[in-house]
């Protein structure tokens, strides 16, 4: 037993003597596919000395001969390099450009009769087919890794959602907030490498919008996109379901080419107008109750499966006065929590209900406001002026009656005046005739007082 110990010691010494250089601990370095990696090798002497880099098959990659860089017959011949400026400092790095998954290997640096081993693991992370996805579609991220590795992956979306997995990660029903830079971290052997992937979610800025208008006002519908593409081509259509209609109908169809919009077909009632450039913009000449309702604009992009959607709603308000009834009405899709009110200006609401129509009987004169509000915030307002009761529609008849009475009284008055005047003239004429007769008979005693001087007693 004791005689075997010296032999084993001798065998170990012989093996160590046969080794060309001592091997230090192996380092692990993670790299990204397509990137550049730098593997370090440091000598104890701060000067340029001879070194060699080899792969696990002992095939030389590169080394030096004096101040010259020499390369071996490895597959990295055209992608391998070193930093000559660091040689005088005792640093002899191996630089590998445009990394590939198959570059994963153990690389050996021989310097000063020592060996430094570096294990390089190259990973790649790619998105499925395209990084431009329609809203609602699924995103799949696939990790490429070297054989024998067992990495874990964790990704964080722009909206802060964390997704964990192995070599495949899937995210369903992408939302607009998922558009942006995704940060993914790959962990292997307590080392990590970070990937950044830009994902563009193709969508409208708003999933739905609502427009509030008074009857007769012009309506503007806008459909801005949440992304920018230099050459955007596709086609679209707006379908509209009026509140009073039994079915929806197509209001307009259009083409989109290089951000230029051209109308293919438009209905005559209503006759929409469409802008010729992005963002998509539609104009309805007048907001009328028969147009109130909901629409759905679809946009199909070239080379993309599926369509973009945006819902748009139109609410129309009308305030009217008919005889002694003041009415406020709204048409279109409204929330049950919305409040419809009628109030006299600068006064409390006369009536306020969660309904689509309210009214006031025998309203006071003044400016009345019809208000549609949500939790105190006014969404739509229409004003109507109520005139005093004497200015009601019966005014012309009253004036006719009053005028007739006044005319009759004037006629009667004039008749009486002319009758009295005529009678007065007749009596005066009779008196003058009597005077002339008396004078002719020389009976001056019967004359008026002014003729008494010429009268003689009978």
Curated annotation (Swiss-Prot):
Region annotated HIV-1 Vpu-susceptibility domain, chain positions: 427-455
Subcellular location: Cell membrane
InterPro entries, per database record: CD4, CD4-extracel, Ig-like_dom, Ig-like_dom_sf, Ig-like_fold, Ig_C2-set, Ig_sub, Ig_sub2
Entry annotated with the keyword Lipoprotein: yes
Mutagenesis / variant outcome for changing residue 265 to A: Has no effect on the interaction with MHCII. Impairs recognition by OKT4 antibody
Occurrences of domain Ig-like V-type (ranges): 26-125
One annotated GO biological process: positive regulation of calcium ion transport into cytosol
Tissues showing expression: Highly expressed in T-helper cells. The presence of CD4 is a hallmark of T-helper cells which are specialized in the activation and growth of cytotoxic T-cells, regulation of B cells, or activation of phagocytes. CD4 is also present in other immune cells such as macrophages, dendritic cells or NK cells.
Effect annotated for changing residue 447 to A: Loss of homodimerization
Transmembrane segments: 397-418
Modified residues (Phosphoserine): 433, 440, 456
Gene Ontology molecular function: coreceptor activity; enzyme binding; extracellular matrix structural constituent; identical protein binding; immunoglobulin binding; interleukin-16 binding; interleukin-16 receptor activity; lipid binding
Extracellular topological domain residue ranges: 26-396
Keyword field: Adaptive immunity, Cell membrane, Disulfide bond, Glycoprotein, Host cell receptor for virus entry, Host-virus interaction, Immunity, Immunoglobulin domain, Lipoprotein, Membrane, Palmitate, Phosphoprotein, Receptor, Repeat, Signal, Transmembrane, Transmembrane helix
Posttranslational modification: Palmitoylation and association with LCK contribute to the enrichment of CD4 in lipid rafts. Phosphorylated by PKC; phosphorylation at Ser-433 plays an important role for CD4 internalization.
Lipidation (S-palmitoyl cysteine): 419, 422
Domain annotation Ig-like C2-type: ranges: 126-203, 204-317, 318-374
Recorded disease: Immunodeficiency 79: An autosomal recessive disorder characterized by childhood onset of recurrent and recalcitrant skin warts due to uncontrolled viral infection with human papillomavirus (HPV). Some patients may also have recurrent respiratory infections. Laboratory studies show a complete absence of CD4+ T cells.
Assembly notes: Forms disulfide-linked homodimers at the cell surface. Interacts with LCK. Interacts with PTK2/FAK1. Binds to P4HB/PDI. Interacts with IL16; this interaction induces a CD4-dependent signaling in lymphocytes. Interacts (via Ig-like V-type domain) with MHCII alpha chain (via alpha-2 domain) and beta chain (via beta-2 domain); this interaction increases the affinity of TCR for peptide-MHCII. CD4 oligomerization via Ig-like C2-type 2 and 3 domains appears to be required for stable binding to MHCII and adhesion between T cells and APCs. Interacts with Aedes aegypti long form salivary protein D7L2.
UniProt comment concerning the protein's domains: The Ig-like V-type domain mediates the interaction with MHCII.
Function, in words: Integral membrane glycoprotein that plays an essential role in the immune response and serves multiple functions in responses against both external and internal offenses. In T-cells, functions primarily as a coreceptor for MHC class II molecule:peptide complex. The antigens presented by class II peptides are derived from extracellular proteins while class I peptides are derived from cytosolic proteins. Interacts simultaneously with the T-cell receptor (TCR) and the MHC class II presented by antigen presenting cells (APCs). (Microbial infection) Primary receptor for human immunodeficiency virus-1 (HIV-1). Down-regulated by HIV-1 Vpu. Acts as a receptor for Human Herpes virus 7/HHV-7.
Official protein name in the record: T-cell surface glycoprotein CD4
Organism listed in the record: Homo sapiens
